[in-house]
């Protein structure tokens, strides 16, 4: 009889690769569009890492467990060490933005159920119009909110699978867009019977494009070729794909307390990435971590005179990830001090560009 666990891993892998191929990966509109798809998706907040324990994500797809796995790989939720877990995280983002993440998970036998929410606070933005390009004096605050439901199950003593359904809402003034996305993954502990070798595979943000609606898309205009007076007409916006990605990672316990891990990410809208992390744990006391994020290819964008009013065809701009490079963090375990299964995670993630604030992430975890 064929091993069901191998079938599960293969099925998720095949589904992920097929989905990426169907949506198309790298170019958006070919040469006329002038470059890659960076920044052209909807629901970009889905790409912001949640929680501090996994830094930029090195090996998280293989090692994330409990409620924190709701973002990285829903399969890990079934591997929680507590029957009830809660988490709350705050991340300082660049340009004075911030991200809040909260979640809870309950374990019932081999099954786990979880709920999570995340919100991106952009702050206030001045209102500008065609007739007031310098601003009207008003300000608005965009809204960006995601809620998710997760189901995870232990398929065997070493294999778990999970699915998350997310609903993301983006809005500004009188315009709003909503998208439903799905995450699915599998984790395997002691892969191929190698003690300490964990493997994980996940596809995230699979869903239909987001379309924006609302009265803010109405504008006053006169229909050409008619005798009609000025009337309201609706601007039909284009659909924007969600930023689907595929991750495959592994982690290995080199020695008691020392783990090294890595993840390969194939992203539908950005360059592919490699994420690495090393962690050393003193049981019951603390864990220290160091991570690294790097892109597998260099992309240069050339502006095309056929798609811009300014001829900049001779200038090339290299597209880099804001968080390329090293990151650091750790966890302090509070059980011996508080008597409850609680911990605090911290991550420091520098940006690679001057003028952008580095990110600091704090996470409080409590288990019962």
For each predicted feature, which ranges?
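Bacterial N-terminal signal peptides that target proteins for export
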Residues: 1-9
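Outer-membrane beta-barrel porins/channels
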Residues: 23-55, 99-368
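Acidic, small-polar-rich N-terminal luminal/periplasmic segments of exported/outer-membrane proteins
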Residues: 50, 57-60, 74
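Short strand-turn segments of transmembrane beta-barrel domains in outer membranes
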Residues: 59-61, 84-93, 349
